[in-house]
Design a protein with these regions (language model features):
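Glycine- and other small-residue-rich loops at beta-strand/loop junctions that grip anionic moieties
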Residues: 43, 70, 166-167, 190-193, ...
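Active-site/ligand-binding-proximal alpha/beta "capping" segment
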Residues: 237-287
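Structured adenosyl-cofactor binding patch, chiefly the S-adenosyl-L-methionine
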Residues: 143, 180-184, 198-211, 269-310
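N-terminal positively charged helical leader segments and presequences
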Residues: 12-14, 19, 24-134
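Short, ordered loop/turn segments at secondary-structure junctions
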Residues: 96, 193-196, 264
Length: 310
């Protein structure tokens, strides 16, 4: 009969020897299977004609209108425009910032995305980049995009409320209202009168991708623009500081155009007289009024609530 000798099992070590732990700690991280493609911006000299053109487009509304282009700054807003399908002509990068960031940074990422979309990528020195930037603390990326405006008659035919900005002068408010309008499901935003340029640098920063996803219309004259909206079957609703009805007590579920006036003076008496309803946001305490962008957002989201519940 066969005999089987017992096998001696060594106890399992709970701790590796010190040399083994040190060896493991010093092991280099494994290389990624697919390293990101390295895209290097093409340097431009300070005398390149593109630089002077960028300065004009960044600083002058007339130049943007003539060129049909606008400027957007910052890697994150530019990435949002790319994702929204915006037509970017060129991308400019601060070479100093470029050299200081790694492949996971938003700056490197947006350059890769732009290059993949066939957008030329140019590099500028820090001083030249600062001279074309509209911000005090440039974020290292600036792009040139197509300025697309939709006719008021086309915006009027789209389902959803239309936001009409009359003589809105602050670009930050304008951009914030564009973004709020998209979030609230508006058909589009119409800028009339002496309103700021919706494609100015500050307005674009506030609106981000909404500036290309949402139809934007412009009209220099207020009355013809309102007539166009009214003839399409839309009811005009004015927001006023006092004397109006609370937003929740006003029917905003149908085909409406909501008017917001200038930060300093609101809507004129003539414009208010052409509207079929007026809205006043109830406020407590001694506060007389709130920011135009805040007021607009309150009314827009009340309209969205009513449409959901209709």
């Amino acid at each position: 009969m066969a005999r089987f000798l017992p096998i001696s099992l060594s106890p399992i070590r709970r701790h590796s020897p010190p040399w083994s732990r040190q060896h493991l700690l010093l092991r280099p991280a494994p290389e990624p299977l697919f390293a990101p493609v390295v895209v290097e911006p093409t340097p431009l000299s300070a005398n390149n004609p593109r630089i002077a053109s960028l300065r004009r487009l960044s600083g002058r509304r007339k130049a943007r209108l003539e060129a049909g282009r606008f400027v957007i700054e910052g890697p994150v807003p530019i990435a949002e425009l790319l994702a929204a399908g915006a037509d970017l002509d060129e991308l400019y990068v601060d070479l100093d910032q470029w050299a200081q960031v790694d492949d996971r940074s938003p700056l490197r990422s947006v350059v890769r995305d732009a290059d993949a979309a066939g957008v030329p990528v140019w590099g500028l020195t820090a001083s030249v980049f600062a001279s074309v930037s509209d911000t005090n603390s440039p974020q290292g990326a600036l792009a040139l995009a197509l300025r697309t405006v939709t006719p008021i008659s086309d915006v009027a035919q789209i389902d959803g409320p239309v936001l009409v900005l009359v003589d809105i002068s602050d670009p930050g408010n304008a951009g914030t209202l564009v973004r709020a309008a998209e979030a609230a499901g508006c058909a589009g935003v119409v800028f009339v009168g002496s309103s700021t340029d919706p494609f100015g640098p500050k307005a674009v920063r506030a609106a981000a991708g909404s500036i290309v996803r949402l139809p934007i219309a412009e009209g220099s004259e207020v009355s013809p623009a309102l007539d166009e909206l009214r003839s399409s079957g839309r009811s005009l609703v004015a927001t006023v500081v006092d004397g109006g009805v609370a937003p929740e007590a006003t029917d905003l579920s149908g085909s409406v155009a909501i008017l917001i006036g200038s930060e300093a003076h609101g809507l004129s008496a003539e414009v208010i007289a052409t509207c079929s309803a007026t809205i006043t946001i109830p406020m407590q305490s001694a506060v007389e009024s709130i920011n135009a962008a805040v007021a607009g957002a309150v009314v827009l989201f009340e309209a969205a609530r009513q449409r959901r519940n209709a």
